[in-house]
């Protein structure tokens, strides 16, 4: 059979079409041997290879054979059944991967927000077990400081009239970020202020309570769940908000070495995968 010849499979009543070269990508698999008529359990009926297995799960099997990637929809739970299908088709690398409980055990992120409120300032510290999440939040949080107008030291009754310049956030480590907002006074006179903006919101906020409310709302929209609140220091008015987010990897890229019958996981990418209706 030519590698460019079109092959149609009937798996449990569902039909799939692909090239014979695709099915030969894993030469030790049942699908490759099928093309050489070396498998008695797979018969040709009406010109189609008939396989008496689960057709809906075969769509994931065929996608893996085509791309060497396992793409599962969000909320997929049939890992044990899919593993049995991989074993039937003798795709050993996929079966071994599906046997690992870490594949379908959600990864838990813990994020903590510490909020210190003083008379004219509010200080924030975000800590997260995932450095990637902290990088994402650091890119979205912007801090601005008022700049003096001219060399005469003129003062303005409204701080919004002064130009604002971006100020870098503090990064004590890869897992936390520190920023602040509020008004600076010297001898009772307003001399400057710091504002905070959190993308995609366009507002520049100076009030710490408003910034806190916006920050918590954004975290909830990002899939975090608030699991606890507590006062770290009642005297200094330090409040701590602890969030949790469970994430499951949905795309795993696998480097397959068919000849040596082994594999290694190169990367694990988290991305939203939609159910594939096309076959």
Swiss-Prot record:
The keyword Endoplasmic reticulum applies. Keywords: Endoplasmic reticulum. Residues 256-279 are annotated as: Disordered. It is found in: Endoplasmic reticulum. Residues 5-74 form the BTB domain. CDD domains: BTB_POZ_KCNRG. GO terms for biological process: negative regulation of delayed rectifier potassium channel activity; protein homooligomerization. One of its GO terms (cellular component) is endoplasmic reticulum. It comes from the Eukaryota. Inhibits potassium fluxes in cells, possibly by retaining potassium channels in the cytoplasm. This is Putative potassium channel regulatory protein. The lineage of its organism: Eukaryota, Metazoa, Chordata, Craniata, Vertebrata. The gene is kcnrg.
């Amino acid at each position: 059979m030519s590698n460019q010849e079109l092959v149609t499979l009937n798996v449990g009543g569902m039909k799939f079409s692909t090239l014979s070269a695709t099915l030969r990508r894993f030469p030790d698999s049942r699908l490759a041997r099928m093309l050489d008529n070396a498998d008695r359990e797979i018969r040709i009926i009406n010109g189609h290879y008939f396989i008496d297995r689960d057709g809906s799960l075969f769509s994931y099997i065929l996608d893996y054979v085509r791309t060497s990637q396992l793409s599962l929809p969000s909320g997929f739970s049939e890992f044990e059944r899919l593993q049995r299908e991989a074993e039937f088709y003798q795709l050993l690398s996929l079966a071994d991967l599906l046997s690992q409980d870490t594949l379908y055990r959600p990864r838990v992120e813990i994020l903590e927000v510490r909020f210190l409120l003083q008379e004219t300032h509010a200080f924030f510290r975000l800590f997260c077990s995932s450095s990637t999440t902290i990088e994402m939040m650091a890119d979205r949080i912007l801090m601005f400081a008022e700049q003096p107008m001219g060399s005469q030291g003129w003062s303005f009754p409204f701080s919004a009239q002064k130009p604002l310049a971006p100020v870098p956030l503090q990064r004590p480590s890869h897992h936390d970020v520190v920023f602040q907002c509020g008004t600076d006074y010297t001898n009772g006179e307003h001399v400057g202020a710091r504002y905070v903006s959190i993308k995609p919101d366009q507002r520049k906020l100076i009030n710490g309570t408003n910034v806190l409310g916006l920050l918590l709302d954004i975290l909830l929209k990002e899939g975090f769940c608030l699991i606890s609140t507590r006062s770290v220091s009642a005297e200094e008015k330090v409040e701590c908000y602890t969030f949790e987010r469970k994430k499951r990897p949905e795309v795993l890229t696998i480097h397959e070495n068919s000849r040596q019958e082994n594999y290694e996981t190169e990367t694990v990418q988290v991305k939203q995968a939609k159910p594939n209706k096309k076959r």
